[in-house]
Amino acid sequence: MTRHHQDRFLTTHVGSLPRSQTVVDQIFSLERGEPVDEAIFDQVMAEAVDEVVRRQVVAGIDIVSDGEMSKISYATYIKDRYTGFDGDSPRRTPADLLEYPGFMNRASSGGGTPTYRRPCCVGPIAVKDERPLHNDIKRVKDAAKKHGAKQVFMNAASPGVVSLFQPNQHYANDDAYLEALAHALRHEYHAIVDAGLILQIDSPDLGLGRHMMYKDLEDDVYLSRIEKHVEALNFALVAIPADRVRMHVCWGNYEGPHHKDVPLATILPTVLKAKPQGLLFETSNPRHAHEWETFAEMKSDIPEDKILIPGVLDSTTNFIEHPRLVAQRIQKFAEIVGKD
């Protein structure tokens, strides 16, 4: 999946990066259905991707991305690319925030919650418009070539995370919905890999789903559901080499109590069944920083070909971690599976 380096660990991130107000204005105009000049939109996005790739290269990031500049959200962007999605759906409140309503109200009133639509699945899912995907691919490849980035990844939603944020109102049951999503998303996955990019599957449904979509289920029922999510993903990836894919699992990138997060030990056996060779996961926030121990305890269960990509910086704090702390976090995992 990635180059191995003799002298140091390669660096990357999980995708979404800050956007300029100009980019935000263009994206939300499109989201609201307002007239958008296609040429201006393309120019704004191309310039934004060029700049964000340049900054990643300057910062020393080895495996860069387009920062998801053109996407309204890492999961709901599919409504612009596939048929079958329309309307809006009620927001599901995470279980941890339900127990702290005062905090939840402050967070929502302070502008910390998204205002974009989360449509429902209301009809058959099929490819509607390939242009946004191919435009994204072209922009990031052009920027990578210009600035000398050697490796590039591109994000794509997993079938499970689409089902998490866009409820099914069309298919007979959740299994049928996942199957339809896997068939449709396979097209996007192949296009990204065929373009020479590393495919990153965003699958927070495996973690976040526990205290959001499946918060009322018993653990065994929840685990059986995410097993289905992994099966759907593996079906979509059946013809793609594992070493061209990595998967991002998290418990929700928001500042909150997170005391309802499912322990990594509970989901790791299921997560490790997913085909992607690379596994990106949280390991630097107060709720999950201790879970390097889980990998140590389950070392024998980690497939030999898996590449662990721990998140050694926390994106929900304003603290700038000391380099020695970051080094310690890396060392803990290197001691478990080796630096290679």
Regions found by a protein language model. Name each.
Residues 1-340:
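Domain-level signal for soluble alpha/beta catalytic cores
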